[in-house]
Amino acid sequence: MSTDIRSKFLQVYDTLKSELINDPAFEFDDDSRQWIEKMLDYNVPGGKLNRGLSVIDSYQLLKGGKLTDDEIFHASALGWCVEWLQAYFLVLDDIMDESHTRRGQPCWFRLPKVGMIAANDGIILRNHVPRILKKHFRGKPYYVDLVDLFNEVEFQTASGQMIDLITTLVGEKDLSKYSLSIHRRIVQYKTAYYSFYLPVACALLMFGEDLEKHVEVKNVLVEMGTYFQVQDDYLDCFGAPEVIGKIGTDIEDFKCSWLVVKALELANEEQKKVLHENYGKKDPSPVAKVKELYNTLNLQGVFEDYENTSYKKLITSIEGHPSKAVQAVLKSFLGKIYRRQK
């Protein structure tokens, strides 16, 4: 991804933000305009922007040539819709998880003047997506498919979040409920669809493709998303907080993490007892005991094996696709996440 494309992408953010804070559907005064602007700047462009930039990247690989300014603008606008959706999920997710930091700074709802106003801000972020789509894509033949796609993916993500939340209900902590199949369901719906399938699906629609004919592409991307989340689970415990931008809390939050599922699979009865007694406790001492057990079970080595096997399987699936352009899109995606440290 050239720095030129990245800077053009960031310029499109400024354009979209300006349109939204001057939206004629609402009579903004200075206070509300400033609030929205601050809220957007704090939550939307702060991450790595991988999802958004992937729309441009994927479209470029499908087209196989230089993009016109118009194509760059439209691919960027779709990329920002993905980033807006992500911001909406994260703002609300942080409230639900009672998180403290996100992308190396305090979560939005933790700011003194924000608090629970963040819940409404999340709703506003979500409502910005159809406004961007309507303004810039209404005349396109694929407009309805785009709206459907974003609605579908939002539903899948919210449903995945629900499984995640009800599996970790306080007072009903039961590790025996956790398995690889539950983990996979949460990951597939909560992360894989919006982080992996959505950006590529946007590029395919923009390129004039029918998504119904690309079920195999969806399957590969969902697999990739699963692999990505396993990496995330691993980094939550073994990654350096200053590198990943947050302090991992999966153990304290009783999350159905790949690590705990694997630990339950590999542990003997005595070790399982340690997990049952310490997993999901907020104090540093039980957390340290869980981490110690993870080291005893060599989960770092188990993860390395998983990473290598997953990579080989994904490459085989990708190379089975008839279109070289689609292969390039999928390989580009995989290249961005293979062996990542954050």
From Swiss-Prot:
Cofactor: Mg(2+)
Keyword Nucleotidyltransferase found: no
Binding residue positions for Mg(2+) 1: D93, D97
PROSITE patterns: POLYPRENYL_SYNTHASE_1, POLYPRENYL_SYNTHASE_2
Residues noted as binding dimethylallyl diphosphate in the record, renumbered to the chain: R102, K190, T191, Q229, K246, K255
Binding-site residues, Mg(2+) 2: D93, D97
Gene3D superfamilies with a match to the protein in the record: Farnesyl Diphosphate Synthase
Binding site for isopentenyl diphosphate: K48, R51, Q86, R103
Protein family according to the UniProt entry: Belongs to the FPP/GGPP synthase family.
Protein name in the entry: Farnesyl pyrophosphate synthase 2
The organism of origin for this protein: Parthenium argentatum (Guayule rubber plant)
